[in-house]
Regions:
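Nucleotide/phosphate-binding catalytic cleft detector across ATP-hydrolyzing
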Residues: 1-136, 153-155, 175-206
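Glycine-rich phosphate-binding loop of actin/hexokinase-like ATP-binding domains
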Residues: 132-174
Length: 206
């Protein structure tokens, strides 16, 4: 029986920022471990945010040991100061709590909130593309979600409050038609590719 679920999150309230954190290791000749990386990551959830904001996810970018060159994997190196650059994804605390409450009312528990463009990338972007560098743009109804990968790591995310519904509303206003007709025009005659179109082309309103 399924009791826990991953839940996608998006919306105008989503923000992202870069942040550097560090931990000091007092043990002499300490060898960096995976536990150290996990401790450093978990400490980022405790940083002060703006009022009403909550951290949704903390994504490591790279690590620095004792002010040395950045590395993706410092495990096994000796050092006393472990720093890391992180991509923080934040959202409105009330909106997040409402999601948790809705899932609980449905009889489940939220295992993890996942930003929707990151979830989409898991379905359509392969590891080679993430290594080479790729930008995923997911145009939905209410928002356009963006995720940029490079060297296999997510480097930037954003949620833009302009999407398909805005296009439908623009067609509705410009053509003075009802919304269902505008949506049908968009779906039947709209194109995302830059192709030559005839200025004299006549279309019929569904």
């Amino acid at each position: 029986k399924v009791t826990e679920v991953y839940v996608g999150i998006a919306g105008h309230h989503i923000r992202s920022k870069q942040h550097r954190g560090n931990i000091i290791i007092h043990e002499e000749e300490h060898i960096i471990t995976k536990e150290d990386l996990e401790r450093l990551k978990n400490e980022q959830y405790a940083i002060l945010m703006e009022h009403g904001e909550q951290i949704i996810d903390v994504i490591p970018q790279h690590y620095i040991v004792d002010n040395d060159s950045p590395t993706l994997n410092p495990v096994g190196r000796i050092g006393k100061c472990l720093a890391g650059d992180f991509h923080l994804i934040t959202g409105n605390r009330t909106n997040i709590q409402n999601i948790y409450k809705s899932v609980q009312l449905a009889g489940y528990e939220v295992k993890k909130l996942v930003l929707e463009p990151i979830a989409s990338a898991e379905s359509v972007v392969n590891d080679e593309e993430k290594l080479a560098g790729v930008c995923l743009v997911d145009i939905g109804g209410g928002t356009t979600d963006v995720a940029i990968f490079h060297e296999g790591i997510i480097r930037h995310t954003s949620v833009i409050p302009l999407a398909g519904n805005v296009i439908t509303d623009d067609i509705k206003s410009c053509c003075s038609i009802i919304r269902t007709q505008a949506e049908a025009l968009k779906q039947n005659f709209g194109a995302c590719l830059e192709t030559p179109t005839s200025a004299n082309e006549i279309i019929s309103i569904p």
